[in-house]
Amino acid sequence: MKINVINQQELREINSKKIKDIAKKVLLNEVGKGNFELNILITDDKSITEFNKYRGKSTPTDVLSFSYGLSEPVIGDIVISVESIEKQAPDFGNSFEEEFYYILIHGLLHIVGYDHENSEEDAKKMFEVQDQYFHQLIKDRRR
């Protein structure tokens, strides 16, 4: 398993080692060991808006996940906007760092097959798992 962190922004310092550690823990737990790569692009609102056009939207978002399948050499790409995270963190009572890792976990779960847009049941399951990882790996209380 190889996790590539590409930092294309200068707004915030990013801890690439911690990003990789969290990603590896979630992926090991969800899919086990594997010979695959995952790319995590850290960017700003302007850049993520360009990626979001793929979804037919012309606005920024906090995270986008592009899953290519767990049997592929590169299982996916995650794009995270530090600007969006910085704006929304106070709304959830999180520091920037806490919100960043919460959103990272969200993106990782999409890569391994979780979804929250198809049904309420799927959404409930995904957010429960996301909260569990957040509680276990980042913050000792639920969001």
UniProtKB/Swiss-Prot annotation:
**Where does the UniProt annotation locate this protein?**
Cytoplasm
For this protein, what is the EC number?
Answer: 3.1.-.-
- Cysteine pairs forming cystine bridges in this chain are none
Note whether S-adenosyl-L-methionine occurs among the keywords: no
Q: Which InterPro entries match?
A: MetalPrtase_cat_dom_sf_prd, YbeY, YbeY_CS
> Which GO-annotated molecular functions does the record name?
metalloendopeptidase activity; RNA endonuclease activity; zinc ion binding
Sorted alphabetically, the keyword list is:
Cytoplasm, Endonuclease, Hydrolase, Metal-binding, Nuclease, Ribosome biogenesis, rRNA processing, Zinc
Its predominant location is cytoplasm
This protein's GO cellular component annotations are: cytoplasm
Chain residues that bind Zn(2+): H106, H110, H116
On whether Heme is a keyword of this UniProt record, the answer is no
Task: Note the Gene3D superfamilies from the entry.
Answer: Metalloproteases ('zincins'), catalytic domain
Taxonomically, the superkingdom here is: Bacteria
Relay the cofactor remark from the entry.
Answer: Binds 1 zinc ion.
- Named cofactor requirement(s): Zn(2+)
Offer one Pfam family short name for this entry: YbeY
One GO BP on record is: rRNA processing
User: What is this protein's function per UniProt?
Assistant: Single strand-specific metallo-endoribonuclease involved in late-stage 70S ribosome quality control and in maturation of the 3' terminus of the 16S rRNA.
Family note? Belongs to the endoribonuclease YbeY family.
Under NCBIfam families, the record lists: rRNA maturation RNase YbeY
What's the protein here called?
Endoribonuclease YbeY
Q: Which gene encodes it?
A: ybeY
